[in-house]
């Protein structure tokens, strides 16, 4: 990821990069914004017998076969019932928006994550928790910048996840289609809507960071892990900008996958991703050339070989 709030804010702006007339109703707008959460809801779908398959789907969609994934998604929209096609297209374009932000933003996040873990050997097995804390801080930063200094008290993260039964049904069909055709994973269509509901439920439970209920959950999780992932996902209530995490001082950093050197702040990475989305979504809609759409870059920002196989987490 970036995390929930940043993806939502990105969707609110990336929707304006779509060709005129693509989004024609409020429900299509909701579907597009929800699509901006990408495969991430499946990471939160722990209250299902299919938890391992759902987690695996979220992982493999992020790391591999991106061109086939989006080709299948586009094909899936073409097979929907005519009354559902526009809604499915809106969701698919939102999922593409999630991917474009991820591939631009993740090198920024991973550069910090790798540096923090390398500097403290005790964090070696806690990369996911470090990743979550960085992205939570970026959520806090972007919420303040995009919504006039707002905090998660003003905009609770769970409230940013909006859907309808119809969107869940159509999006579920598309995600099930991609899971089976591209990755050979059997995910019934109903699992997507349940995953979204579980994502909402979890954020209601853990927010805000530092609350009594969050501390209690963290203590329980601490019986199993050295550091709490759920505590890392929760957002701080603060009016102080996370300047260091967002690199607002424009220190030099290096893309860990390409070695490209930059002094961009995170807000500048966000804006660069918006420009990228405008170009990428035009290719997706007009040409269907998915190699050109993805450039064989996965959601982490790692450039893969032409077969786009990659079998490990960063």
Specify the residue positions occupied by each region the protein language model found:
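N-terminal leader/auxiliary helical segments
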Residues: 1-94, 99-314
